């Protein structure tokens, strides 16, 4: 795997960034074409074993379940300091599900900095 510097951050990331929009719990979020956790973990494990250390996800991908699956896979297959996770926090979520009428969740810094 080839690696490059990520801007001026000092981080080295794989030239391939694995997008995780297709990973998630079916029924959470606006689309039903996501891969369930078992299939997602298989892809993530192979990716890590082949040197991919750069992953892209978002709070709105399957209403957060993409981030959850990625987090568990990283915990099982890599050291957290060996991977770079790019995410987005702009997608309004209500009660963990897109489109719910309940109050917004996860829109503050405290939700993302753990």
List each model region and its residues.
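Active-site-proximal loop/turn and secondary-structure-junction residues that shape catalytic pockets
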Residues: 22, 89-93
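Proline-centered turn/helix-capping motifs that create local helix->coil transitions or kinks
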Residues: 79, 94-96
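Glycine/proline-rich, positively charged
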Residues: 27, 96-114
């Amino acid at each position: 795997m080839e690696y490059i510097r990520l801007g001026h951050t000092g981080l080295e990331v794989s030239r391939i960034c694995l997008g995780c929009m297709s990973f998630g719990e079916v029924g959470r979020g606006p689309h039903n074409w996501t891969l369930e956790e078992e299939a997602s973990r298989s892809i993530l494990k192979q990716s890590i074993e082949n040197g991919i250390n750069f992953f892209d996800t978002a709070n709105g991908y399957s209403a957060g379940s993409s981030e959850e699956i990625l987090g568990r896979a990283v915990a099982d297959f890599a050291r957290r300091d060996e991977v770079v996770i790019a995410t987005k926090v702009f997608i309004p979520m209500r009660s963990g599900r897109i489109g719910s009428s309940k109050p917004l969740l996860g829109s503050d810094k405290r939700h993302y900095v753990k």
